[in-house]
């Protein structure tokens, strides 16, 4: 039963990864068309770095492209500002955990 569960988890992860690649390709096409208007091309933004000014510029992680995650921050003056950082969404963290676990088991 455990082997079946691991195999199903791996299949779900692989399907998620392949669909993510297709989505990332579409995002890349949109990003390239936007960047064509800019004179200089910026490098991608690493994990845990700020992406407030460039929400589509996050780097690619081990399996998935990082996503720009935003939150509203209230300063000491009571002013609300939006702060964003590149990170891995929870469902993708779970997929990476399953793949890592599968690699440890199957070599």
Swiss-Prot record:
Keyword Secreted recorded: yes
Disulfide bonds: 44-59, 51-68, 58-86, 70-84
UniProt keyword terms in alphabetical order: Disulfide bond, Knottin, Secreted, Signal, Toxin
GO molecular function list: toxin activity
Signal peptide: 1-20
Primary location recorded for the protein, binned into one broad class: secreted
Propeptide residue range(s): 21-41
UniProt-annotated location(s): Secreted
The protein's name: U1-lycotoxin-Ls1p
